[in-house]
């Protein structure tokens, strides 16, 4: 079993117990880098953090690009640095929110990535991942050929295509989460956070305030000291941004979690 372990603040102290326990039970421990962009985060920082995770007992490293911010050449450089720094496999987990994942994953593969995360095409793109079938086709006949059969994958695709229509029809999948939004490059909103925020605004009858909330998120994040936006910090920052917009005044209502 692969146990993917991450901390929203990239603080190794918060991972000690989880890594120790997973190792004790014989699991494959995948230590995650919560990837983000800020004045204090760069590839050297992430490489040093990955080395710390390896020393703590991680069996592989995952670049957890939850907001799809990883650009192709930055990905290439980061994977190269990680491969030079650690002796364990490197996985790329990049969401498609900003439309960069396919390009970034391809460059990451060229840089030596050992594993990449994808999703079957009916459940891909948007806040999900790049399509599995597309990557399999792109790598056929190369040194990176996956060996997967596209005809067999098409059987799996057909199954999930029906589920996709079902979930769209009953509202479990929002069409807004299926498209590419380049604004993510400015607002740094990960997939899960975007879906949660849409629900909050819908429940409050304020769906028209989405653009205002997206613009508020980087301001709230800066106020909080540039935390990577991944569970739980994404929900904490996102909820506070929603309140700031809905209340008509910044920090008129402050959540207990944000305090």
Which residue stretches match the model-derived regions?
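Catalytic cores and adjacent flexible loops of soluble metabolic enzymes
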Residues: 1-259
């Amino acid at each position: 079993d692969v146990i993917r372990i991450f901390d929203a603040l990239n603080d190794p102290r918060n991972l000690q117990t989880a890594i120790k326990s997973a190792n004790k039970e014989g699991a494959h421990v995948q230590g995650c880098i919560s990837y983000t962009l800020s004045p204090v985060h760069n590839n050297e920082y992430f490489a040093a953090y990955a080395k710390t995770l390896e020393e703590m007992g991680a069996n592989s490293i995952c670049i957890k690009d939850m907001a799809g911010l990883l650009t192709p050449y930055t990905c290439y450089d980061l994977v190269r640095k990680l491969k030079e720094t650690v002796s364990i496999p490197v996985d790329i987990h990049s969401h498609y929110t900003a439309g960069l994942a396919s390009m970034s994953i391809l460059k990451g593969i060229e840089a030596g990535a050992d594993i990449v995360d994808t999703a079957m095409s009916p459940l891909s793109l948007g806040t999900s991942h790049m399509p599995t079938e597309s990557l399999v086709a792109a790598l056929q006949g190369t040194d990176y050929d996956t060996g997967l059969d596209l005809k067999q994958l098409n059987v799996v695709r057909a199954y999930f295509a029906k589920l996709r229509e079902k979930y769209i029809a009953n509202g479990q999948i929002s069409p807004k989460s299926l498209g590419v939004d380049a604004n993510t490059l400015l607002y740094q909103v990960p997939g899960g956070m975007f879906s949660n925020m849409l629900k909050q605004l819908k429940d409050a009858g304020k769906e028209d305030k989405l653009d205002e909330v997206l613009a508020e998120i980087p301001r709230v994040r800066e106020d909080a000291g540039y935390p990577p936006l991944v569970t739980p910090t994404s929900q904490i920052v996102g909820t506070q941004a929603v309140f700031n917009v809905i209340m008509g005044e910044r920090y008129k209502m402050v959540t207990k979690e944000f305090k």
